[in-house]
């Protein structure tokens, strides 16, 4: 809950201090740190368990980093816009869904999180090998590379166009993973899929914020609510795997999410 509150607050704050045309690039830079954290989480937890016999020491470390970040932000002067007389409520957030760009982007974030969690769930099951955990590691490692390159590319290329390119490639990779059985090919496909998914959240968030810049706080609330879509991925992918006994068929769910994101990117490009 605390982490979610921080995410809701930080993204609109960023929107007030960066140029609108570069917002996607700046948000992507933030994703670099997030993806690096995800990549390092497993070795950190493993090291803590080996040293102390418990992973719970991770919690005070996380709390300490959060406090340090909060104090740093508190001591940094940030020119915020004047506050409105009335605070935004839940109804104000949902009212923004009447805007087509906001609706497409919110559903896009929901599909992105669902696909992201689905890939994490399936990637270790696509290879019947103790080293299959490396597929998840490779996925997040390639996500880091994707965010690094994306932060540079998005300064020069339209964010929606770049999203369309990536989702076209991602859909082809999802289709390939339905049939590929070679371990090296699976590692490569999952890694490149991670690269293609690197800038999705930043793009949808930036598009929605630029559509209604005066409602940046409400947009942030919608986007964070959309993250809850990740909760359905495990049960749905698990049900598919149990029903057919084939983890590769779970990629159908991921492919459906990616197909929506590709369609949404085309619609947003036409709107722009």
What role is predicted for each listed range?
Residues 160-204:
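C-terminal transmembrane helical hairpin of 12-TM major facilitator-type secondary transporters
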Residues 1-32:
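Cytoplasmic helix-loop-helix junction between adjacent transmembrane helices
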